[in-house]
Amino acid sequence: MSTDAPPADGDDTFWRERRTCFLTTFRPDGTPHLVPVGVTYDPETRIARVISDGASRKVRNIRAAHDAGAEARVAVGQAEGRRWCTLEGTAVVKDDPASVADAERRYTERYKTPRVNPNRVVIEITITRAMGTAKPSGW
């Protein structure tokens, strides 16, 4: 499918409704680390965001991949009944105030205002693949 123009039948609402998602990162030894998270997704930029404490295992896994000179490959997914979607891509950790504030705003729109965390960072995932029965527009 062309990635230039989103089809009209994408299921963007599935990524706006409140639900628990899961993020998979990989430890330095290659084993998967799967955790429940809140995810926001922007179909126009194809970027998913997860807010997190900067000392969390998921953040350390992503930073370790970059420190080793590799891309940090990750996946986020969610399901409800027979509807499901997994988004795969590459992740970076951002800690600059503008990126964190933007991610917090997006999180608040989908979930609720996050608790105060002075160590908060945002994991930004550039999506390279979408699969499932409720894929967002463009896939």
Name each region found by the language model.
Residues 1-22:
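Short, basic/aromatic recognition patches
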Residues 2-5, 81-139:
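Charged, gly/pro-rich active-site loop segments
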Residues 10, 22-26, 110-115:
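Short helix-to-loop capping/linker segments positioned immediately adjacent to catalytic or ligand/cofactor-binding
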Residues 18-54, 73-77, 86-87:
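Short beta-strand segments
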Residues 69:
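Active-site histidine-anchored catalytic micro-motif
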